[in-house]
Each structure stands twice: as C-alpha cells, then as structure tokens.
C-alpha cells in the first residue's frame, strides 16, 4: 500500500549540444536508474534530446529528424519499463516547430505538452525558432508513427494521481498554464526548463516554484539543464527541485559537473485533503477559461512497493533550525495580542492565573506578564494563585513561588486541602479512595477559587489548558477545562515546552531563567494524587495517556489532513523509528482516537481563545463535531493493523 504517495524524479543528465545520440543514451541511463529506485514519473530538462542551446540549428531538418529518431530509440529501449518519462524535444506540427515535452511509457507516446509562453527578450529568442501552443490549430500530431494528443492543456490520469506539464517560461507568466491544469485536476505539475543563472535569480526561482506549488495546492517537479549546455553567453546550473504545497522536499546541487537524479515522494492524499478543506480552491474551478483540459488515461502497471526517501518531522508543530526562534516569537505575539484585546474590551482590572509550577500555567503567566507590559499596566495587577493540594510536590510548589516572585506579580497562596476534605465529607466520599471524584474535586475547587477571586477583583481568569490536553480530554470538565479566556488552547504540548524555553533564554534574568528551565525539565502531571514516599511526582500524565510527542503527531495528521489511522500509523513508524516500537505506537494511537471521540463534549463548550497555528479545536471555528459521534470505524482500522 502506497498511502497516497507518488515517487517522482527530476533528472539532470549530461548533454552535448546537437548530439542526439549521446543525449538519448544519457536519458536512457537515468530512466533505468530511476526505474530501479521505484520512481513512477521522471522529468528531464527542456530540449533534453537535442540540448537547449542549439540556436538556429533548430531550423535544420537533420537535427529535427535526429531528435525524432532519438525519441524512437528511447521508446524501443524502455518498452518493458513501467515508469512514465517526460523528455524535451522539438516537434514538427504542420511545418511549425513546437517546444515540446513528450510523455512516454512502455514504448508509447501518451501525449505532447506544448510550451505556451516563448520568451523573446534579453538573452532569449525562442520565437525565432518555435511556435506557441496558443497558435496550434490541431489537437493531435504524428510522432514516431503514432497519432498523439498535443497541446498545453493535457492532463495525464492514473489511478494514483493526475498530472500536468508546463515548460520553463510558462511558470513565469502572469497566469501560468499550471494554474488552469491544477484547477482541472492536476495534482502534480512537471516543469522541464532551461533556466540560466544570474545573481539572485536562483532565490527568485525557488520562491516562484514554492508560491505556485502552494497556490495550486500541488506537487511541483522542476528539472533544468546543467553541465554540457553551451556557455557562449549564459550558464546553466542544473536545478532539480521538488516541492509539495509550498514546501521543499528535495533539491539538486547547483553547478555540479556530475549527472543528478533528484527523487522524492509527493503525498497526493495530502494534496487532496488540502483541496477539500480549502473551499476557495473549489470556487476557483469555475474560472478555468474556455479551453478545457484533455484527459489521457494511463497506469502504473507494475508499480513496486513504495519506499519513502523523504523524511517526516516527529514534532510537526515545532519548526526545525533557525525557524524555531521566529516561530516562537510569532506564536507568543499572537497570544499577547489576543489577551490584550480581551482585557481592553472587558475593562478587566486584573488577570487571575492559577500557577501550578507546570508548563501550561507557566506559559499562560508569561503571556499575561508580556501583555500587561504591552498595555502599560502594572504587573501587580496580575494575580498569581498557587493552590497546593494533596499531590503538590516541593519542586512544583517552589518553582511556582520563585517564578511569580521573579516576575514581580501579586502572589496568593490558598491551600485546597481543607476545602476538599470538607467537600468529601459533604458528598460522603472516602478520602482514601483516589478515584476520579477525588481528582476532579480538586480541579474544580481550584477553578472555583480563581473565578471567585476574579469576581472579587473585577478581573478575568486566564485559562492554561493546551491543545494536546483538550484533544485528549485530559482536563476536568468545568474544572481546569474552564476559564474566561484561554491563551494556550491552540498550542500543542510539544510546542509549549519550546515556547517556555525560548522565553527563558531570550527575555529573562538569570533567576527567572533558572526557574523556567527547571519547569521545562519537570515531569508533566496534574498532581492530583499524593506524591510517592520520596516526595516525588507519582502521577505522571504520559504514563497514563501516552507520550505527548506521539499524540501531537497523531493530532497533526488527523486534524490537519484527515488521514486515516493506518496512514498515521505508517508515518509514525517512520518518524519515531528509533524511539518507539510498532506495538507502542499502535497502543497509543488507539488511545488517541478513543479519547478524542469520547471527550468531544468538553471541546463543545470551550472558552474563547486565539487561534495560533494551522490547527484549532474551537467549536466556533475550525472543529465542529458532534459530541456523540462513534469512533468505531477508526478503532476497527487500528485493531486490524
């Protein structure tokens, strides 16, 4: 099972200008290598059979005939191969020459994609030799003894995907042909190019491909000629680039004197999910113009079992490398802006936050502090309330106190033990029975205290619960589940950790930094069960519901793309290959789906809070799900894995 992935390649072969025999040999060699690696579709550079820099030689009959003979040789020598190949060559149609991409498979020409926009400025003179697809009067051409479709509007359909083609300058047009092709069904765009180099041009090219890939919600495979093309006036660096919905998957080395084969896998299921979600894409389909695409059916008859070469980030909510700092700053700024508007609108005089010494309440407090600073309000009007209970440890208690002191906010300490003991007596609950009643009573007592203090001080209770907890329902209904404004509600646990660490290292004095970093290293726990005999945290959340890094991974692919459990399981086994075994992943995947469905009733009445990333479970916005939906089909698929 390929789980919606299509393996593609951008080839950058050696070339000799006007030496079709040499070029065909190099093309055949790379096709064979790609076939051996399980590639399903491969694209070569523009005019790959002749070379792009032939100039006025394109008017020579012998070169045009040699090109067709070269194509015939490729057809004969790849007749037994399942791979679809896209090669570039001049094609004669009614005494005109077309700059063409010829699509071939198993000895047959499937179709000829014609270049629409012929550059005729600066170093380019293509209109001197070629005719645009816009001037074609026929929709078929004779090539290698076959009558085949020709045009700029061809779509090639397989059971795995539908793809279209544009050629070099087409991408640079105001409305590229790929836009129309995508709107009519193309999920992958292949571009064969002869893109010469200039200072700053490569960065612009990558930006252009990224944007077009994102705008079309498509995969984009780009192959441009390299070593061997004439350097009389320009230089070609051999750019091979593969993008998926704006993100770079693979790229070639520039200015490399060796042949290159750039391989990756396009996730067509992901593209389809994005298009389903993005209703603007569907609305745009009415604007495809009068020239409708011509569909050409083919198939990957002998497709091998897919082996992925692309990687998957085990923490999809957390950017890698230099982007992390920028991402953290942006997330923090969104939280601050959301809370600032709500404080101004409600004219709240205080912000009330329950401080446990854990990650979530720490992040919420940091947001409050920076919001008050932004609004020019005194930090003393932030009321940090620590409420020790039966499971509170010295470590979390001391961290809570130290953090509040270092930030200069007002501190209130109210033990919940006496109130809970009285409550247990009132409802006739044995204090030695540490069940759900025992735990939830403490959470609700804390929420009641915070709400009453907010009323007492004309304030607002700022919620601390994060996206991961809310997805799993790991919150007490009408306890920590409830607040007057939740600043962490769309931030997953894996990102909360990095946010707190980022603030510690970039915006805190040494005392506050030390406390924050210790909080980052503290085991995640609601501390509702008494500590162990050594005073350490006994109730560890990840021992009970599973690792948050796994649940965040499941959550991302379930909500963001609507993937089925089997595909999420497949991807998780790749992403966490050296961390968790298959049975562990399966166990917690089942837990995730069971809890996600069972706990929707808590998400149906969430307090307001800002959307920060691409995923939110606000019942008023991104996620509208009935509280009594059945999880049967999801759990059954996991059971069958």
Give names to the regions the model predicted:
Residues 1-352, 370-379, 411:
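Enzyme catalytic cores with a strong preference for nitrogen-chemistry domains
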Residues 7, 23, 159, 216-218, ...:
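ATP/NTP-dependent adenylation/nucleotidyl-transfer catalytic domains that generate, transfer
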